[in-house]
């Protein structure tokens, strides 16, 4: 079997001239609140990006992400326009949302609802009315991609925090979303589990062409771009890959962004010459090298030109395009 091509994924999913997320003049106020948590916010994320949404507690980053997912959108006074892959979130049906937008919570205990790993991965598929044969195929493909095939009959309660979060990610990806939103997904993980989770997330972005947006308190050097949100506005944007020393981009103080200002309007254009230079976060070989990372690296991912989605491998080595 051919080893995975680490070059940029082709196709619509990684088109830097198209937006995966488009937010215009967004304002949102929680019931009973004296002030809006988001006010006149403009924000755009290109397709295929690995983006960080960085801000402190109360900055509005979690609210912004949840508003892009109709099933979990908070109650409150809302104005403005939100679009995902060109479709208005306000008009998006639940099925379309499930198949377009994936969401991973900070705490996997808030996301895992089934007793076994297999049933957790099949839960969303069953809710969409998928046939049992198709569910089995999806679970097999996704578990193999993430290296979870040996976990399928394990009780979810027996998994470590890092494995639970990886399971949450895999269960979401079984639905084949094209945009993936994550709210502080590694804040409760130890350093080894965090590195393995980020490596899996990086593969989802690079190999499947999935646009990834991660909300974090502090910026990290592994992203394509970072957006700083403060007082309900996207204040600044950094093109992480175009700067020499990405490790020293930001100070611990969130006011230390002056040296990396690339744009003021919350719109980032991903430069094609930056794509090939990106590497997985950290030295993966120094992390706890689990069997899932070794096995899954043997497959070639392919992008569907019809819908811009990536491809999950079959367990026999052939590939299945996302539907």
Question: How does the language model describe each region?
Answer:
Residues 17-23, 28-40, 72-75, 91-93, ...:
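A short, flexible loop at the N-terminus of ABC-type nucleotide-binding domains that lies
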Residues 69:
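Helix-to-loop junction immediately C-terminal to a conserved catalytic motif
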Residues 77-88, 97:
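Conserved ABC transporter NBD signature motif
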Residues 133-151:
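Conserved ABC ATPase "signature" region
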Residues 155-159, 163:
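Conserved ABC ATPase signature
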Residues 176:
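Conserved catalytic motifs of ABC-family nucleotide-binding domains
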Residues 180-183:
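Catalytic Walker B motif of ABC-type/P-loop ATPase nucleotide-binding domains
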């Amino acid at each position: 079997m051919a080893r995975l091509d680490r070059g940029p994924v082709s196709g619509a999913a990684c088109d830097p001239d198209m937006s995966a997320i488009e937010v215009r003049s967004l304002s949102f106020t929680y019931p009973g609140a004296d002030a809006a948590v988001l006010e006149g916010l403009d924000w755009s994320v290109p397709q295929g990006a690995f983006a960080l949404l960085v801000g402190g507690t109360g900055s509005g980053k979690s609210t912004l992400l949840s508003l892009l997912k109709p099933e979990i959108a908070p109650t409150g006074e809302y104005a403005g326009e939100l679009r995902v892959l060109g479709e208005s979130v306000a008009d998006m049906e639940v099925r379309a949302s499930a198949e377009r937008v994936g969401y991973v919570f900070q705490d996997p205990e808030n996301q895992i609802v089934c007793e076994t790993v297999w049933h957790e991965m099949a839960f969303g598929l069953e809710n969409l009315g998928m046939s049992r044969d198709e569910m089995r195929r999806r679970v097999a493909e996704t578990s193999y991609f993430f290296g979870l095939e040996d976990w399928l009959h394990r009780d979810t309660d027996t998994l470590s925090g890092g494995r639970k979060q990886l399971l949450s990610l895999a269960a979401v990806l079984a639905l084949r979303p094209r945009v993936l939103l994550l709210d502080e997904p590694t804040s409760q993980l130890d350093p080894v589990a965090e590195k393995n989770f980020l490596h899996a997330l990086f593969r989802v972005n690079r190999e499947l062409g999935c646009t990834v947006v991660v909300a974090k308190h502090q910026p990290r050097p592994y992203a394509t771009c970072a957006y700083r949100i403060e007082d309900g506005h996207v204040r600044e944007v950094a093109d992480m890959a175009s700067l020499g020393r990405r490790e020293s981009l930001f100070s611990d103080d969130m006011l230390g962004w002056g040296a990396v200002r690339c744009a003021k309007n919350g719109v980032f254009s991903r430069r094609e010459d930056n794509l090939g230079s990106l590497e997985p976060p950290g030295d993966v070989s120094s992390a706890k090298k689990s069997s899932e990372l070794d096995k899954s690296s043997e497959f070639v991912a392919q992008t569907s030109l019809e819908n811009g989605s990536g491809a999950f491998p079959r367990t026999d080595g052939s590939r299945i395009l996302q539907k």
